[in-house]
Amino acid sequence: MLVYTDLLTGDELLSDSFPYKEIENGILWEVEGKWTTKGCVEVNIGANPSAEEGGEDEGVDDSVEKVVDIVDTFRLQEQPTYDKKGFIAYIKKYIKLLTPKLTPEQQEEFKKGIEGATKFLLPKLKDFQFFVGEGMHDDSTIVFAYYKEGATNPTFLYFAHGLKEVKC
């Protein structure tokens, strides 16, 4: 199995269990998330609850929670939204932090494509949810989530150059 970690922080952000499609000249990866239910596991331990003290099943939480698979699997943490000015400031900082960690070939690809990717992302800012890895570092790679027109499941966008492939 391959896990993709944040190149800047080491937080796990994605795995090969979630297929991706390259967009914006390979600068962004597009991944489809799915809503799933979590919780409400019925366990039959063979005991006769009516014969034991306590009556009701005490201490059993059978609540059901709807979660998005990618957010839940990688414990992504939602962040406040960005306005255009804040997003541009983040992108400038991100480029400055990420570029030295890339090979010269990757740096060239990233520099060529980041402007187009930024122009692709800017009009969608109001529609995005922003996530970072579990560590919630200030310098984290942002993962963007939004709903395509008519979709019931979210689509996630990752900066491809900000991910490091790790074999597990």
UniProtKB/Swiss-Prot annotation:
- Give the UniProt keywords, A-Z: Calcium, Cytoplasm
May I have one GO cellular component term? Answer: cytoplasm
Cite the PROSITE patterns for this sequence. Answer: TCTP_1, TCTP_2, TCTP_3
Task: Check the record and name the SUPFAM superfamilies matching this protein.
Answer: Mss4-like (SSF51316)
Q: Where primarily located?
A: cytoplasm
State one molecular function term (GO). calcium ion binding
One Pfam family here: TCTP
Q: Where is the TCTP domain?
A: 1-168
Q: Where in the cell is it found?
A: Cytoplasm
* Spans traversing the lipid bilayer: none
The family this protein is said to belong to: Belongs to the TCTP family.
Role of this protein: Involved in calcium binding and microtubule stabilization.
Q: What is this protein called?
A: Translationally-controlled tumor protein homolog
Q: Record the organism.
A: Brassica oleracea (Wild cabbage)
> By which gene is this protein encoded?
TCTP
